[in-house]
Amino acid sequence: MARVTVEDCLDKVETRFDLVVLASMRANKILKNGYSESMENEKKEKATVVALREIAESEITSEQILRNEIEG
């Protein structure tokens, strides 16, 4: 997927508002913990783009994001 759009992500979450919150949580987690080895090609992209791509491609679910946020 060359470009991530909101429409790609809305299939995975209920509303645009949920998408904003979840993507920001995931982007903050990426910035805090750094890019993993599996994200090596994505280091050129901003964390928000990586987070949106993960959501769109179902690499991470809203439940996983929320669980990670609660666990710290």
Curated annotation (Swiss-Prot):
Recorded E.C. number(s)? 2.7.7.6
Highest taxon listed in the record's lineage: Bacteria
In terms of Gene3D superfamilies, this protein maps to: 3.90.940.10
ATP-binding: present as a keyword of the record?
A: no
Q: What Gene Ontology cellular-component terms does the record carry?
A: DNA-directed RNA polymerase complex
Q: Which InterPro entries match?
A: DNA-dir_RNA_pol_omega, Pol_omega/Rpo6/RPB6, RPB6/omega-like_sf
GO BP annotations, alphabetical order: DNA-templated transcription
The reaction(s) annotated as catalysed by this protein in its Swiss-Prot or TrEMBL entry are: RNA(n) + a ribonucleoside 5'-triphosphate = RNA(n+1) + diphosphate
Q: Which family does it belong to?
A: Belongs to the RNA polymerase subunit omega family.
Its quaternary organisation is:
The RNAP catalytic core consists of 2 alpha, 1 beta, 1 beta' and 1 omega subunit. When a sigma factor is associated with the core the holoenzyme is formed, which can initiate transcription.
What is this protein's record name? Answer: DNA-directed RNA polymerase subunit omega
Q: Which organism is it from?
A: Francisella tularensis subsp. holarctica (strain LVS)
Gene field: rpoZ
